Amino acid sequence: LVLLVGACSADIAPGTYFCGPEQLCPEGLTCDAVEDICTVPSQAGAFECEIPDRTGDDEPAAGLLLQPALDCVSGVRELKACLFVDDPGDWFQFSVPGNCTSAVQIEARLTYPVAYEPVAMQLSTDGAAPVVVDGECRVAATDTGGQTSRCVEVVVENGSQHAIGLVHSGALNCGGDCAFNRYTLSLQLSTAQ
């Protein structure tokens, strides 16, 4: 009786896996920073962002003012941008109307690829120092596709002024080699729950 024993290894086709945290890919593949997928090294591209970095929005007081203004109960405002290595952060300013008839909350969802440095969400209220506010989302995103989401729901005062910032987390950034990311911020005001 002859017993044949052989080792097998799975063949992983390029483009079948999204890049993991810190650009992690299966052996023999590398992260294509254009598509956020694992591919053969010869086809991997460098990180690109089609949205130019806005200058002067690097702190709460200088954030881009959202126009038109948000209502007491507003539709979702979606903002897409990138956080570059040399960019301290992107800030967006908005006000809560002073005439809301019920308590209002800020709802924000930040979505970004897991392959690069996680983006942190900070909130400054009425000119105070910003604080990190993001946490796990109560409702998971339906199509994650190599991305993750962080959320915030916070009750705020009528007539208050806010700046929401998307900043470097300082973690899982490949020792600085992937200290960048693309993101989508979905922001709205709603009746507090």
Please tell me what each predicted stretch does.
Residues 74-193:
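Acidic, Ser/Thr/Pro-rich low-complexity intrinsically disordered segments
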Residues 8-50:
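Secreted, cysteine-rich disulfide-bonded mini-domains of extracellular proteins
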